[in-house]
Design a protein with these regions (language model features):
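Flexible, solvent-exposed coil segments and beta strand-coil junctions
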Residues: 44-50, 81-88, 142-158, 217-225
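Face-selective signature of the C-terminal outer-membrane beta-barrel domain
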Residues: 154-226
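Residues that define the transmembrane beta-barrel architecture of outer-membrane proteins
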Residues: 48, 62-66, 99-103, 168-172
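Short loop/turn motifs that connect adjacent beta-strands in outer-membrane beta-barrel proteins
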Residues: 42-49, 76-77, 112-115, 181-192
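Short strand-turn segments of transmembrane beta-barrel domains in outer membranes
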Residues: 25-27, 34, 38-70, 91-92
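Transmembrane beta-barrel strands of outer-membrane/channel proteins
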Residues: 54-58, 84-86, 120-124, 192-206
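Residues on the lipid-exposed face of transmembrane beta-strands in outer-membrane beta-barrel proteins
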Residues: 68-72, 82, 105-109, 174-180
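Outer-membrane beta-barrel translocator/channel fold
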Residues: 2, 25, 90-102, 106-168
Length: 226
């Protein structure tokens, strides 16, 4: 993956995965999904004592990234976890701010004989980015020539100054497993089971540019809201 120049922004894939298969249509916008929690990204826990994990770091210029998780077992067979991640990064260039949020809740239940397992999660997340379309050719030339007025990246002119896009998603997921054999060890790789899954996910993507721009040609010479 090749990242853009700000945290929480898009990633460009430098290769293609020929083994990835999707049985249902996807929304696209793959470059925006690098920080999007997919079904397989959600974790389920089983802990003897309550566990808390905190993560914090500063971002580019102004902003912070934090992620908090707490999980505990109400009894030896039932666990739940709650997590929240928030990120805001101003970026090095004009109109490049990122603002991401993600709330996750998951649970894990096992019967006493471990023949039945029930897991599920709920996720609500949004990934918002200001888009500047890159630095103008004139500003890039002045920066490369070492013009003292253009040493700071934050003063370079960009192609788009009011553009914004956002990807929102909500998902509910449940899975039931009934093990026919091989339940004496949760890590038994020779087990046999039947399962049932339920997945309900909605995604919403919007792109707005309230300032007239000729960057995309006459087809987008007016205000854009798509």
């Amino acid at each position: 993956l090749l990242p853009f120049v700000n945290m929480g922004h898009a990633f460009n894939k430098l290769g293609y995965n020929f083994f990835e298969e999707n049985l249902i249509p996807q929304i696209g916008k793959k470059s925006k999904h690098a920080s999007y929690f997919k079904t397989e990204d959600i974790k389920y826990y089983n802990v003897p004592t309550p566990f808390t994990e905190l993560f914090f770091r500063t971002t580019m210029e102004q902003g912070q990234l934090s992620d908090a998780l707490i999980t505990l077992n109400l009894n030896p067979n039932f666990n739940f976890a709650i997590a929240y991640r928030g990120m805001r990064s101003q970026g090095k260039y004009v109109n490049q701010r990122s603002n991401n949020e993600a709330f996750r809740y998951s649970f894990n239940f096992n019967s006493k004989d471990y023949k039945y397992n029930f897991i599920g999660h709920y996720v609500s997340q949004n990934i918002g980015n200001n888009e500047n379309g890159g630095v103008t050719e004139q500003s890039l030339l002045q920066f490369e020539l070492g013009d003292p007025e253009f040493k700071e990246r934050s003063v370079l002119n960009v192609r788009l100054k009011r553009a914004y896009n956002e990807l929102k998603g909500k998902r509910s997921f449940f899975r039931q497993n009934f093990f026919l054999r091989g339940t004496e060890n949760l890590k038994n790789e020779n087990s046999m089971s039947i399962f049932h899954e339920f997945l309900n996910e909605t995604k919403f993507y919007i792109y707005e540019d309230i300032q007239r721009s000729e960057y995309f040609g006459p087809v987008a010479s007016e205000e854009v809201k798509d």
